[in-house]
Amino acid sequence: MMELLASIGCHFRIPLKTMWLWISLVLVLQYSKTVLSDSNYLIGMGSYDITGPAADVNMMGYANTEQIASGIHFRLRARSFIVAEPQGKRVVFVNLDACMASQLVTIKVLERLKARYGNLYTEQNVAISGIHTHAGPGGYLQYVVYIVTSLGFVRQSFDALVDGIEKSIVQAHENLQPGSIFVNKGELLDAGVNRSPSAYLNNPASERSKYKYNVDKEMTLLKFVDDQWGPVGSFNWFATHGTSMSRTNSLISGDNKGAAARFMEDWFEQNSAKSDELGTDEIPRRVSSIISSIHNNHHELLELASSFQSSPGKRATRVSSAARRVRSALRQADKPGFVSAFCQTNCGDVSPNVLGAFCIDTGVPCDFNHSTCGGKNELCYGRGPGYPDEFESTRIIGERQFNKAVDLFNTASEQLKGKVDYRHSYVDFSQLEVTIPKEGGGSEVVKTCPAAMGFAFAAGTTDGPGAFDFKQGDDKGNPFWRLVRNLLKTPDKKQVECHSPKPILLDTGEMKQPYDWAVSCNNIS
């Protein structure tokens, strides 16, 4: 290269300063090419408010008609990431501070994305999930059984979710930059317990022996690192219910996972601010679009920085300190905000009320097999680590997830490689054929049937007991409630046999008035 430049210089008499400028430009281009080639993906983070109506709306989760919102514990958000190959496929994942995702919400979000981006984001590559908080506004789902307690569809809840999810994805799309993804896993032992341990013991010993615990205690974390800015986000998956806030709570809340997300985002921003205060000699890349020649103007920048007034009104005497503040301001103005999501996974019977279930009248442990107190389910409640303060329990369980996530985040070293891909399909669970092993050897093909809720369902759980005289584990039923059921829909013989030994309380899968009560065909991503 030097010989070529020397030759050009002899023939065209290029000034030495100009020659070195071109050399620097070539080196920068080569360096940029190397950086881009080392990045496997484009990554982008987004976050937007989805709080919705904060008063006079039934909350989604406990199916308690008396749980009406009357204020805000803390606001709810939709947090998104996009991962794309520069010239290939891309995927979107959205984590909601909501009880669950809604197909109706998803359809409307996809309509808006199509209007913006064409076929770039579709049902095939967009997945939306909820953290399963039981303290968010209800009325946004399309099946009757989920909106009975909210007395139907609530437009304000629906619109807040659609708007927030769309804007979160738009943010992530606009933040797409070359970057890398790291994965890490670890056990978190004190943030979830099995709330139905007697039911778990009904599983065959051979099945239970495959697992270390009676619930999943593994957290999996993805760390997103922007080539320019460094870490810009983390999403982790861990199983524990969003029921630290009780069924009598009336304040909108993201519960323990929403709290954990706020803790981690605050932690990162505080640490980032401290790092900027310590300062480095490296100037952010995008400053070059503001200042034509950074290095030639270095002294001028320092003089400018020293002329700034400090907070008490005195002249800043430490040039280096003021310069760092200028660099920090320039950096923060362009830097995407750090997004941390604490996502839900196989939380089934995993409760954050880790102290166990106790009778509220006597203080003794609830009946082990049926979670009752003197035969009544209404008196049996799980206790969180901050008992009797549910806000403290929310903070503690959130903090435990946050601490584990920070540990995994700081030690994440396994980098993800390979192609970006996705899978999506619609599965009709009301008539699904499944091959199962037979006792004594061999196998047989069985078929599912439309959904139905049993008597035990109405008993609720230790996180949120039901009403009346229902009991967990009830496989007999009750003549009175069968009579009430038949006023709505009497299940036929085929349906009863299919669900046996579970007695049917509500034949939701076959109830169609005024429209479907329960889903039959699920979309799986």
Task: Describe each PLM feature range.
Residues 1-25:
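Classical eukaryotic N-terminal signal peptides for Sec-dependent ER targeting/secretion
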